[in-house]
Amino acid sequence: MATHAALAVSRIPVTQRLQSKSAIHSFPAQCSSKRLEVAEFSGLRMSSIGGEASFFDAVAAQIIPKAVTTSTPVRGETVAKLKVAINGFGRIGRNFLRCWHGRKDSPLEVVVLNDSGGVKNASHLLKYDSMLGTFKAEVKIVDNETISVDGKLIKVVSNRDPLKLPWAELGIDIVIEGTGVFVDGPGAGKHIQAGASKVIITAPAKGADIPTYVMGVNEQDYGHDVANIISNASCTTNCLAPFAKVLDEEFGIVKGTMTTTHSYTGDQRLLDASHRDLRRARAAALNIVPTSTGAAKAVSLVLPQLKGKLNGIALRVPTPNVSVVDLVINVEKKGLTAEDVNEAFRKAANGPMKGILDVCDAPLVSVDFRCSDVSTTIDSSLTMVMGDDMVKVVAWYDNEWGYSQRVVDLAHLVASKWPGAEAVGSGDPLEDFCKTNPADEECKVYD
């Protein structure tokens, strides 16, 4: 088995957010076709409502907690699950649902999705996926407005105007905004106007008024009252920011450039056709397409000390999934070796960034990183040091599955901070880690 296989350890304490059900990856087709078995989906209750009940009755039955025999609540017990809507059931929307469905005892309940294709497209594309394989969950069309996933009813609506979506009627707590369209305050704010409480944008946000969070980097800054609209950044920022944080803390980043060799996405053209970016207008499966990316600059949104120090470009290539970041930086610390750099990553991977960052020592290729749960995997054999202050680091990431795991993590973080949720942890990942690992070198600050 590949040595980079990541332990899918949560960034959220287990009383609020449990681990992915599998600790170790299987390669290469592990996502939902081999990794997620139906018997493991025990975290979701089957509906006990009869066939004549309305969709709303069925949803209520699934989210209202079962009666308990004691008047004393169990510490850390989730009293009621937060109701989630997915707006846009494309690559990230469907990956998010699969990732969420594989989590046991999630504090979330997906009750509705908005997709222009209706129930037929939503059910078929969820069940059969060219990258993930066949979903082992039972996916059925219940009626022309409802699908079921292992008996769990999910309403399907089709409306391109967020203001007309039934979020108030359904009591939606969190909207996963996955269209890539409503990424600014006015756009994403339409979900709030429609009755939702919170919005998580699965893309870089436009506007300084929307805070960005990258799990493993700055999630400790989130609080329920900080903002109603937040961003999970981009897949590339989720790859770059964790290891940039390690490099900056250990060696001090002076400046650097990044290139992401990125799989093609739906924003490109299958055949040559008009596009606002003339390079993305060219056939995605036939070309290496240089294009822009804001991922390097966006790192400063979660690591403010790096503002103005990083920049980069993207090369879109003819692969459907998995991407790789190549970062070259100048550092303050002199006299480093490649092993010094890799050791810093191993320390982070086994400590406060466990489940977010991993290190791979095997000579692998992109397909081996499909469905990697972590945000970033350092390819240790490609780490280089030139002169006394130049460092090159290469890191792999699954730009769909790994990113969607972080969206679930961020949604779980939002749930853990919800009014009435049991307070757990200090909010500082390093401090929480050091409570159980006091002998670790990084924990001396807490002595």
Swiss-Prot record:
Enzyme kind, highest EC tier: oxidoreductase
Up-regulation conditions: Repressed by darkness and sucrose.
InterPro entries noted in UniProt: GlycerAld/Erythrose_P_DH, GlycerAld_3-P_DH_AS, GlycerAld_3-P_DH_cat, GlycerAld_3-P_DH_NAD(P)-bd, Glyceraldehyde-3-P_DH_1, NAD(P)-bd_dom_sf
Compartmental location: Plastid, Chloroplast membrane; Plastid, Chloroplast stroma
Pathway in which the depicted protein is active: Carbohydrate biosynthesis; Calvin cycle
EC number: 1.2.1.13
Signal sequence, renumbered to the chain: none
Residues involved in D-glyceraldehyde 3-phosphate binding: S234, C235, T236, T265, R280, T293, G294, R316
Catalytic activity: D-glyceraldehyde 3-phosphate + phosphate + NADP(+) = (2R)-3-phospho-glyceroyl phosphate + NADPH + H(+)
Chain positions of site Activates thiol group during catalysis: H262
Pfam families for the chain: CP12, Gp_dh_C, Gp_dh_N
Transit peptide boundaries: 1-80
Subunit details: Tetramer of either four A chains (GAPDH 2) or two A and two B chains (GAPDH 1).
Name of this protein: Glyceraldehyde-3-phosphate dehydrogenase GAPB, chloroplastic
Gene source species: Arabidopsis thaliana (Mouse-ear cress)
